[in-house]
């Protein structure tokens, strides 16, 4: 009854925040075995407090475009929970950004950061600003205007933002530069920085590498591996590119990539250098890949199956949804399973619908939910914070080894928790309960 009461209250209070509802529903319904066995969580109103952000900050961002016209966007930062450490979570610049999207991402971040073993609370922020087709100067002016409003709410031991969709190293650089001018301090207030001013080696690789490490841990328990296996990866940003890179390093065969306009299937396996050239150097579109590789076929989004994504209709052993939320529907899940998919590891946040997740759990495949499988990114952000605090950078090998260890520990925690609650293949339950218990314990200990 406790979970049902919370969900009803949420629906009544925020009726139009469908992404936030989806994230909360997925998480707290899997907490039922824990909540039924321990009534102290209800006594201390932990769920009520957990789903309500500690602070929501919204602000106007005014900036000048290249035609000297004033443009106005909306910026926000949702500081969700600081029970186990300073707020930590990315900034997203995309037209889809609204309160519901940022709250879902912030809520997910709380549980994800809890799993990392590092002392980080959860937050998320961003703007409805679209960096696509903007000039370098327009992006710089927007970032400076955004930081003019955000700077008073963040700090190295208060709230440490990072990048997300639409916010890469370039944007982080502009944001950091403006923060430094405003406060006259050089401190680790942002992660994802360039290597010459406090960034960490292995940061851009971290989410993708970590996702593959987690998938390998899941498969190892079943006496299997990714070596020699065909893999489908969606997206073509940092997460997708470095998922593909790590898959190639371990001998797997990634055959797909995508962007908002369509997807490519390369029967010979993805040419990583070409993909990096198109997406990182040129900032081009994925269709350019098919123009340069005769082995590749391009499918535009208008030709995708109704209610589905063409990328998940390519037969594969393992799928790595690494683009955006709700990119993998129940139709896609059915298709993946019927084509023999044995492993799904989520590089993106909430890429699978709740109905798709149910199918994966029923099929008992190796399914790594995003808050566990993609926690490598924020883990290395935490390691960047540690390097900034000590003013001592670490080598790529040291950071990668620490990342690999953290992903192993996350898997171990998730797997042991699932076994504790008599559902050993349910890593959704394992991840949510393991993440929740740590945060809840800290919340109860610190009082109301």
Curated annotation (Swiss-Prot):
InterPro entries: Aminoacid_DH-like_N_sf (IPR046346), Glu/Leu/Phe/Val/Trp_DH (IPR006095), Glu/Leu/Phe/Val/Trp_DH_C (IPR006096), Glu/Leu/Phe/Val/Trp_DH_dimer (IPR006097), Glu/Leu/Phe/Val_DH_AS (IPR033524), Glu_DH (IPR014362), Glu_Leu_Phe_Val_DH (IPR050724), NAD(P)-bd_dom_sf (IPR036291). NADP(+) binds at residues 207, 238. The record marks 164 as: Important for catalysis. Substrate binds at residues 88, 109, 112, 163, 381. The keyword Oxidoreductase applies. The keyword NADP applies. Keywords: NADP, Oxidoreductase. One of its GO terms (molecular function) is glutamate dehydrogenase (NADP+) activity. Its EC number is 1.4.1.4. It is an enzyme of class 1 (oxidoreductase). CDD domains: NAD_bind_2_Glu_DH. PROSITE patterns: GLFV_DEHYDROGENASE. It catalyses: L-glutamate + NADP(+) + H2O = 2-oxoglutarate + NH4(+) + NADPH + H(+). Pfam families: ELFV_dehydrog, ELFV_dehydrog_N. The active site is at residue 124. GO terms for cellular component: cytoplasm; cytosol. Homohexamer. PANTHER family: NADP-SPECIFIC GLUTAMATE DEHYDROGENASE 1-RELATED. Belongs to the Glu/Leu/Phe/Val dehydrogenases family. This is NADP-specific glutamate dehydrogenase.
């Amino acid at each position: 009854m406790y979970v049902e009461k919370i969900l009803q209250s949420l629906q009544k209070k925020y009726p139009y925040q469908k992404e936030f509802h989806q994230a909360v529903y997925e998480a707290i319904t899997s907490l039922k075995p824990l909540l039924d066995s321990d009534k102290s969580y209800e006594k201390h109103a932990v769920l009520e407090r957990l789903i309500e952000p500690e602070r929501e900050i919204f602000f106007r961002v005014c900036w000048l475009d290249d035609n000297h016209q004033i443009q106005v966007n909306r910026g926000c930062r949702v500081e969700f929970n600081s029970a186990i450490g300073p707020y930590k979570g990315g900034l997203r610049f995309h037209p889809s950004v609204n309160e519901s999207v940022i709250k879902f991402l912030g809520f997910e971040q709380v549980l994800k950061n809890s799993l990392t073993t590092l002392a980080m609370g959860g937050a998320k922020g961003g703007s409805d600003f679209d960096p696509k087709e903007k000039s370098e100067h327009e992006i710089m002016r927007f970032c400076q205007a955004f930081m003019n409003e955000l700077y008073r709410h963040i700090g190295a031991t208060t709230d440490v933002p990072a990048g997300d969709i639409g916010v890469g190293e370039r944007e982080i650089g502009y944001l950091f530069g403006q923060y430094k001018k405003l406060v006259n301090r050089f401190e680790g207030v942002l992660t994802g920085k360039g290597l010459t001013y406090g960034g960490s080696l292995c940061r851009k690789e971290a989410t993708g590498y970590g996702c593959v490490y987690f998938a390998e841990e899941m498969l190892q328990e079943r006496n299997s591996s990714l070596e020699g296996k065909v893999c489908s990866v969606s997206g073509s940003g940092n997460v997708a590119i470095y998922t593909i890179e790590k898959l190639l390093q371990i001998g797997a065969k990634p055959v797909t990539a995508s962007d908002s306009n369509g997807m490519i299937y390369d029967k010979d396996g993805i040419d990583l250098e070409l993909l990096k050239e198109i997406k990182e150097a040129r900032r081009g579109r994925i269709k350019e890949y098919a123009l340069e590789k005769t082995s590749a076929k391009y499918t535009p989004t208008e030709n995708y199956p109704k209610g589905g994504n063409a990328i998940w209709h390519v037969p594969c052993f393992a799928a790595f949804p690494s683009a955006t939320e709700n990119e993998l529907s129940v139709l896609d899940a059915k298709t993946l399973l019927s084509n023999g998919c044995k492993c799904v590891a989520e590089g993106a946040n909430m890429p699978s619908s709740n109905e798709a997740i149910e199918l994966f759990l029923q099929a008992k495949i190796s399914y790594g939910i995003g808050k566990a499988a993609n926690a490598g990114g924020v883990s290395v952000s935490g390691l960047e914070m540690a390097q900034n605090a000590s003013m001592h950078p670490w080598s790529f090998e040291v950071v990668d080894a620490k990342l690999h260890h953290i992903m192993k520990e996350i898997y171990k925690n998730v797997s042991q928790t699932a076994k504790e609650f008599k559902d050993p293949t349910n890593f959704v339950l394992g991840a949510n309960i393991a993440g929740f218990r740590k945060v809840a314990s800290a919340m109860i200990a610190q009082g109301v």
